From Swiss-Prot:
Protein name: PIH1 domain-containing protein 2
Protein family per UniProt: Belongs to the PIH1 family.
One cellular-component annotation, GO: protein folding chaperone complex
Molecular function terms from GO: small GTPase binding
Domain of life: Eukaryota
Amino acid sequence: MTVSSKGLLTHISQFWNMLDDLAENDPERYRNFIQQELKDGKQLCVNPEPQLCIQTKILKPNEKVLFINLCQWERIPAPQSATRPVPVSVGRPEDSAEASDAYTIIDVAYNPGVLQAAEKDQGIKDQLIRMAMLCIEERLQFTLAHSYHLTSFRLKGSIQRMKESLMGIKTDFPDLKAMTRTENTLARIRSSTVSEPNHLPEVLLTKKQASAKGRCLIEEISSSEIQVEVKKPAYELKVVKDRNEKPLKIELKVELPGIKSVSLCELSVSEVDILIEVSEMYRLCLNLPESINTEMTTAKFVKNKSALIITMPLA
């Protein structure tokens, strides 16, 4: 038996001795501890359940296809109320390749009740997808394309890979010796199920946090405002060329009947796509035919025609 194995057995023996002492000196606390461990253990064994998979693209730091697995998991708490933020957990990214195609997989988990509500309401589903993308951008410092599409499959990869990603599991053993150095050994052992707990804590996004990036895609999911039908506006997209037929810029004209103020329009532009949301009445997301220069992009609102005109010079 190696020295490390002996040390491991020693610490396990110490742990059992502590449990024996607790059972003898404080039976009530011992009973509560065991009941909580059984409850947590059962919850820990429950696998995340894949619900849908979306495909989008990472633009920065390196351009790559991205698959986002949205799953429900009982380990994720439900929102405390209809006006509180929605807890969400983001797994670590995993780079993969099939044949010559390289891509990244990221798993995002919600409480089952949250995703069940999304099954009945497309507006809620879109909110949750946008929330997942924003979480990925903020947590991993990625820049994602605004456009996405639902894949024909519910899961990219395996259930086991998804669970390990969300839990941050590694193959090495946790440092039991370090855990026995304080009086809070039992609490530490309970929290040592995953080797890197920073992967698991929920990310709470409030409206204030979301607006810090310039636009608010996230509302409380139970808000009655989600029930408003969002229409796709009429638009005209054209590529302007020079005398030699070389593309110079893209012009997009969007008709927004009933809108009289540019303050109601929210515009997000990336190098490859554009997203327009207007006062919860209109929503337009387009892939652009050419890569554009986002810093040189301009927009103007023609009030008497209720039209938004966007000019996007090519990169």
